């Protein structure tokens, strides 16, 4: 989609955070299959995590419920993070690990403390891609009203969280390190 500016982790690993892999699933795209992101021009600043996907706080343990409503995150959450060992270039042809966080499809985040992809990248010489996906009713919800609401079967499936993780695989064709 374009060039990225990342950062260097304390352990020396290269890190890119908050890279959009789909259009935000809000408004008319809520409860629809993910759509490709809009390309950006210039360099994208990939230095901050994207938001956790909208979820209840009872299963989002490390996240703070700032307004006390029992929920955290945002519907605009389809972002991924990439971690690579220091001094890596495309010529190294390192393996890529695609990491999908746990949480029983009801909670979680690709930047959950304790799941630091930079450690794996640096220690095992692997590129780690950590993806966010819609959880709970935003990711798996079906209603008869959706039957005529989409352009195709994926929009009517009720499996948007799974489709998010499939959509995020665009990196397999696009990932290069310079």
Region annotations inferred by a language model:
Residues 1-160:
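Non-catalytic accessory segments of hydrolases
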Residues 163-175:
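Short, well-ordered amphipathic alpha-helical segments that serve as non-catalytic structural scaffolds
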Residues 178:
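Short, well-structured active-site flanking segments
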């Amino acid at each position: 989609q374009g060039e990225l500016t990342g950062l260097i982790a304390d352990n020396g690993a290269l890190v890119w955070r908050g890279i959009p892999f789909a259009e935000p699933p809000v408004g008319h795209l809520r409860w629809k299959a993910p759509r490709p992101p809009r390309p950006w021009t210039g360099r994208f600043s990939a230095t901050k995590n994207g938001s956790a996907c909208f979820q209840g706080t009872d299963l989002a343990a490390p996240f703070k419920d700032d307004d006390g409503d029992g929920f955290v995150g945002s519907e605009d959450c389809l972002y991924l993070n990439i971690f690579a060992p220091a001094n890596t270039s495309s010529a190294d042809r390192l393996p890529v690990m695609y990491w999908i966080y746990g949480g029983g499809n009801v909670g979680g985040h690709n930047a959950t403390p304790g799941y630091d992809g930079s450690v794996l990248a640096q220690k095992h010489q692997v590129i780690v891609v950590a993806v966010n996906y819609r959880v709970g009713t935003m990711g798996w919800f079906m209603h008869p009203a959706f039957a005529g609401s989409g352009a195709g079967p994926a929009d009517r499936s009720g499996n948007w969280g799974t489709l998010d993780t499939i959509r995020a695989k665009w990196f397999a064709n696009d990932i290069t390190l310079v």
